[in-house]
Amino acid sequence: VVVHLAAVHRDDVLDPMDYQRTNVDGTANIAQVCVEKNIRKMIFTSTVAVYGFAEPGADENAPINPFNEYGRTKFEAEEILRSWQQQGDRSLIIVRPTVIFGEGNRGNVYNLFQQIASGRFVMIGQGRNQKSMAYIGNVVAFLNQCLSTTQHNAVYNYVDTPDLDMNTLVQQVRLQLNGRDGDGLRLTYWLGMVVGYMADGWAKLSGQRLPVSAIRIKKFCSTTAFSSSKSNLDGFTPPYRLEDAIKRTVDSEFINPDPDREIFYTE
């Protein structure tokens, strides 16, 4: 069995062809090796980015409408693997996770939590937009169950429920860290976008990667709420509740950090 996790997915990649070379050409290479080695089962981690800015509650049958090169190339990779699967007695399980977080994961959720912990966080927009999230411990458990399933061809979004709006998420993290809730300073959406475009201009001129960009602010303020049929995978039940997963992550990263823990940089 091949579990295909590799991808270029940062939103500040300087050469757009990096997405094509890794996500598409790299996947084609893996499929070819599977043919040569007679490997007949693959689990492919794609992304909900293939749906773009989808309607809230989008499921696995939602229209494919990626808004960036990451989503486009990941769907192209899916199509390559579907062709591979259809050419013989082969099994393909495609998993489309939403944003993943957890201990040791340096991604967008960690960046948000770090800003809150530092006291420098500024809320942008009304904060009522919902965000689907996925805890790494649950994603790993789901992929592990994919290894043993007898299904031959399936697509699953991976989402941990319930979806939280940004106000609730920020308040929950701030309460755990500081013993008080509230969301602190706030900018309007349009002012936040002005800051984002200014940051984009500076990044282009200086060649520096900045933590703020227009696309990141747009994604932060958008609703990205998805539904999932993951329970159809042999009755799968995630081992961690979302609320507990957030608490575990905040505690591990900011309250009782382990200096020897391995770190994975995904953003």
Where are these regions (language model features)?
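NAD(P)H-binding glycine-rich loop region in Rossmannoid oxidoreductase-like domains
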Residues: 1-25, 33, 51
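Substrate-positioning beta->alpha
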Residues: 29, 105-111, 125-147, 154, ...
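Conserved Rossmann-fold NAD(P)-dependent oxidoreductase catalytic core, especially the SDR/UDP-sugar
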Residues: 29-69, 93
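Flexible, glycine-rich beta-alpha linker
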Residues: 51-52, 90-111
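Active-site Tyr-X1-5-Lys
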Residues: 53, 65-96
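Glycine-rich Rossmann NAD(P)(H)-binding loop
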Residues: 102, 124-129, 156-164, 174-175, ...
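Conserved C-terminal active-site "lid" loop/helix of NAD(P)H-dependent oxidoreductases
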Residues: 136, 171, 195-236
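Mid/C-terminal beta-alpha module of Rossmann-like enzyme folds, strongest
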Residues: 146-211, 246-250, 256-267
